[in-house]
Amino acid sequence: MIANVIAEAKLKGACGRIDDVQSVASLTELMFSPQGREFCQNTKFLRVDRLNHIADEAEENNVFIGKRNVLTTSHKSAFIGSKGRVLCSGTEAIYNIIVADNSHVEIVATNYAVVMVTSINGTYNITKDNTARIL
């Protein structure tokens, strides 16, 4: 299953790091890298119809494909054709959130959280306290 996604990414011009991808976990890790986010933005690669067959395994890595009513506190999460809420709190790491393919995400940022949002044909609303920062 993952081989088809890798082959399509190569055809669309993914960076050389795609050659190191052996699993959905390593694919999702690459997706959150600066190069991965740029590739996904430029090619609109993150689509439900392209990735639905890896949805269950992707969800184990906080990548939600075609899901509803998702609630997560993960520092890295992606929503692809999904709806959900991300609760961001604290300074342990920067929250990296990808919102793609008509997803809608509510982001709640508190307690000095730093949040980076990448929107690829998705929408999001942010509620934050005076300490949180959005990049």
Feature roles, as predicted:
Residues 1-101, 106-135:
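Short, glycine-biased loop/turn motifs at secondary-structure junctions and
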